[in-house]
């Protein structure tokens, strides 16, 4: 029999980290350059990249237009992050809730 492989859970990844690592870095784009291209303040872009600000619907629309992705892609990344973070915040409370049958 094979050995059991223990897989550790990945940390909750903010949408800003994905924006930076998967889109900006490969394009050699800075927060400033992206901000200029999509018409939002550079401080807003920097806060998103640092995980201090959410990607909102308006920003998702601009990012999707610029990168040729869907708005749902960006909002989905943000929602997954938010749900996992909140699940961790209220984990004990959730454990007390009985599933209704």
Task: Kindly give the residue locations of the regions a language model identified.
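Short, charged recognition helix plus adjacent turn
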Residues: 75-101
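The alpha-helix within a helix-turn-helix
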Residues: 24, 35, 64
């Amino acid at each position: 029999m094979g050995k059991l492989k223990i897989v550790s859970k990945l940390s909750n990844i903010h949408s800003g980290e994905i924006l930076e690592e998967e889109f900006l870095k490969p394009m050699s784009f800075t927060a400033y350059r992206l901000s200029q291209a999509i018409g939002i303040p550079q401080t807003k872009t920097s806060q998103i990249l640092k995980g201090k600000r959410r990607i909102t619907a308006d920003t998702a629309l601009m990012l999707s237009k610029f990168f040729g992705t869907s708005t749902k892609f960006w909002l989905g990344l943000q929602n997954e992050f938010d749900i996992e973070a909140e699940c961790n915040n209220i984990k004990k409370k959730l454990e007390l809730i009985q599933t209704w049958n």
